[in-house]
């Protein structure tokens, strides 16, 4: 791939990169959908494994792209569970109380230089994750200045709202455009 932009998406449902393509203009854009069995069954005993599978795949892909295409600027994004995957993959350390052997090692610090932006839509809050025994999402310090976290008003997954409908409105409430503009401005 020629130097350009690469979008790594961790999402709970099929995503379209059409809006992103219009934002990067003449630059080349590649899209990679993280390969993991996304689910909204947070109470399932298999749920933690699905998230770990996503972290492993996203981290491997980001690191591989950084090595094989060092001039390419990557954007990491996700919605809901995908936002959790994207957030966890940026962590500088394995969360306390998580067995180190059960999860992928954090990405090498130099990989952060290849990630232009991280956009998280409806990332589950610490309170929400805690209900299921999951650690809070801790964006690594090298990624914090390039991360945009968006939570819709009333969203009960990422915020303190009480509207289950709000969590499904990102595609129509303007926040996808806001995230795309943020990412494009960093490329």
UniProtKB/Swiss-Prot annotation:
Cystine residue pairs: 15-69, 151-158
Pfam family membership, one: Cutinase
Active-site annotation: 80 (nucleophile), 155, 167 (proton donor/acceptor)
Alphabetic keyword roster: Cell membrane, Cell wall, Cytoplasm, Disulfide bond, Hydrolase, Membrane, Secreted, Serine esterase
Primary location class: cytoplasm
Top-level EC class: hydrolase
Domain of life: Bacteria
Residues the UniProt record annotates as site (Transition state stabilizer): 81
Name the record gives this protein: Probable carboxylesterase Culp7
Native species: Mycobacterium tuberculosis (strain ATCC 25618 / H37Rv)
